[in-house]
């Protein structure tokens, strides 16, 4: 396993839609393992393949187990997992605002409004289709990582003024990281 370099915004790869994974082979399995190692090394909750320069529809996450009262049956959080070719099939009308950060936009966090619940289908490493219902941080992180796969940075959900300020700061931070 290897720690991969994380792509820092602004970078064209981060605003490019990732392509479907058509063959889940040993190279893809190795990439998933490397992404987990990279995410843990960077102390992140999630990491999309585009964030390590691979324009494929894959992300990894580790949302620690938590108990959420008053959540519908079948929803909740999970630990370490990954998704290949994820697709959200259902989003709740109910939305929540929470602060998010991103390994590709270091030293920033912003309040973002997102749907509270979702259902997502995806492929596992055995090429089997899976379905997951999610709420809380799990749902939020799935939406954040799926945005990456669609070429959308989380700061795009901000007003134009806040987005422009966030990108200006990102440019300064990137210069610091490149030194």
Swiss-Prot record:
Q: Which UniProt keywords apply?
A: Hydrolase, Iron, Metal-binding, Protein biosynthesis
Q: Where is the active site?
A: 145
Q: Which GO terms describe its molecular function?
A: metal ion binding; peptide deformylase activity
Q: Which cofactor does it need?
A: Fe(2+)
Provide the top EC class. hydrolase
EC annotation from Swiss-Prot or TrEMBL: 3.5.1.88
| UniProt: Fe cation binding residues | 102, 144, 148
Reaction catalysed by this enzyme: N-terminal N-formyl-L-methionyl-[peptide] + H2O = N-terminal L-methionyl-[peptide] + formate
The record, for PANTHER family, names: PEPTIDE DEFORMYLASE
Functionally, this protein is described as follows: Removes the formyl group from the N-terminal Met of newly synthesized proteins. Requires at least a dipeptide for an efficient rate of reaction. N-terminal L-methionine is a prerequisite for activity but the enzyme has broad specificity at other positions.
What's this protein's family per the entry? Answer: Belongs to the polypeptide deformylase family.
Which HAMAP family has this protein been placed in? Pep_deformylase
What is the name of the protein in this document? Peptide deformylase
